[in-house]
């Protein structure tokens, strides 16, 4: 689920309601909204990849975002890498709120990318993951 809820539960449920009713129809609009800042050359790939997801998988992923158990039940005491697109929507204290739950978190915000930063800048993303794994001796 989400590390922290991004809105009260009833608002999150309402936000995802179109996806629960008609995943493919709702997902197209949802994805397009997240692609507004996206690099034009990868937009079709991202959109087609996301829409190829089976309905039950997409719906399950959305439902897990309703689970706020991390926010309400203790800490994650393992190394965590958070890579997020810079967005004025995020609360100003998000880094502090996240690291309170996961004290070993490495928190990165990236400019010039959308929600799909791993698909827009795969080499840079993979390098950050590789460095994180190496630094934390996870392999």
List the predicted regions and their residue ranges.
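Catalytic active-site module of serine/aspartate enzymes centered on a nucleophile-bearing elbow/loop
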Residues: 105-139
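Conserved loop-alpha-helix segment in the C-terminal half of the alpha/beta-hydrolase fold
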Residues: 79-114, 119
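Conserved alpha/beta-hydrolase catalytic His-Asp/Glu region
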Residues: 4-10, 18-75
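N-proximal accessory regions
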Residues: 15, 77-80
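Alpha-helical elements of the RecA-like P-loop NTPase motor core of helicases
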Residues: 59, 92, 127
